[in-house]
């Protein structure tokens, strides 16, 4: 019986694996979902060679999408990960520990960057047998390069490694570094879950517009434009949100009537409670998925 010849794709993958072995700045992604794809897209747009990026993704449709971007996508971990200087963990938190088992033998010298919600660096360090761990909390606007990511590094991470992480996550938007890991749970509640709050209010404004006689499409367009414009105004202004709000709120006017109604309904206090619930869930996820 003859030996089957490798396919063109298999031959190309072997060649690329050999090329990566000589690279000192290769990046591996464990998980190839939306956030990983956003980071990869940002890296490629800024000139990172596709040959320097490899992804472990078990699902064939996701691998196919990644291959269209020109990066190497494999269904499982292997020796090709030995070439990675940075490993980005973009897996669901409940899958992190199991996913780490076949990877850690190949990546002990790498810097590890986790975007998995809730999993603390202590757990990640233990699972991967490495102290070079950075934890990130991005948000979904990263998918269009408009995100914000908060970062925390363990003490053993060098300034050069922190700079590299800033470069990588900066491809998806802004970055900030935190002093303590506990602050990441607050960030999760604020900006991590924050886009959902915005969408929630957009939905409410659309429904209110429809109830007042506007077509749904127009109501939604007005709401979205208002959020974009107000957000940009807040970004460029040196004045706090309270002052900006007061400037729109004339005594006895329409905005004053709306704000008074919201204050009577304790909207602000309810919003704080909602964010605290998100923070507590982030804490619980760290205990639930990272205790082993």
Predicted regions and their residues:
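Extreme N-terminal basic, low-complexity initiation segments
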Residues: 2-10
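NAD(P)+-binding Rossmann beta1-loop-alpha1 motif at the extreme N-terminus of oxidoreductases
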Residues: 10-75, 82, 127, 210-211
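NAD(P)-dependent Rossmann-like dehydrogenase/reductase catalytic/cofactor-binding core
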Residues: 21, 224-292
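Rossmann-like NAD(P)(H) cofactor-binding subdomain of soluble oxidoreductases
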Residues: 40, 54, 60, 69, ...
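Small-residue helix-packing motif on alpha-helices
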Residues: 53, 80, 215-222, 244, ...
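Internal alpha-helical scaffold of NAD(P)-dependent oxidoreductase catalytic cores
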Residues: 124-132, 148-186, 199-236
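Short pre-catalytic strand/loop immediately N-terminal to key active-site residues, enriched for Gly-Thr
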Residues: 133, 183-189, 241-246
């Amino acid at each position: 019986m003859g030996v089957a010849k490798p396919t063109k794709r298999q031959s190309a993958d072997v060649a690329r694996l050999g090329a990566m072995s000589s690279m000192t700045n290769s990046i591996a992604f464990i998980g190839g979902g939306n956030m990983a794809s956003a980071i990869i897209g940002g890296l490629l747009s800024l000139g990172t060679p596709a040959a320097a990026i490899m992804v472990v993704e078990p699902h064939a449709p996701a691998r196919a999408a990644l291959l269209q971007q020109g990066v190497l996508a494999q269904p499982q971990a292997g020796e090709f990960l030995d070439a990675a200087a940075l490993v980005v963990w973009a897996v669901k938190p409940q899958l992190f520990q199991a996913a780490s088992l076949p990877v850690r033998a190949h990546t002990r010298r790498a810097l590890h960057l986790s975007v998995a919600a809730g999993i603390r660096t202590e757990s990640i360090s233990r699972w991967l047998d490495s102290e070079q761990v950075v934890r990130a909390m991005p948000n979904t606007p990263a998918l269009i390069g408009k995100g914000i990511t908060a970062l925390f590094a363990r003490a053993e991470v060098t300034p050069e490694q922190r700079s590299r992480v800033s470069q990588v996550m900066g491809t998806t938007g802004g970055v900030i570094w935190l002093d303590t890991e506990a602050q990441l749970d607050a960030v999760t509640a604020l900006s991590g879950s924050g886009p959902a709050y915005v969408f929630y209010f957009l939905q409410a404004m659309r429904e209110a517009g429809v109830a007042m006689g506007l077509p749904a499409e127009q109501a939604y367009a007005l709401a979205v434009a208002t959020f974009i414009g107000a957000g940009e105004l807040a970004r460029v202004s040196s004045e706090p949100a309270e002052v900006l709000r007061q400037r729109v709120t004339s005594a006895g006017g329409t905005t004053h009537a709306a704000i008074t109604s919201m204050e009577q309904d304790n909207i602000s206090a309810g919003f704080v409670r909602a964010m605290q619930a998100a923070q507590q869930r982030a804490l619980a996820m760290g205990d639930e998925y990272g205790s082993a």
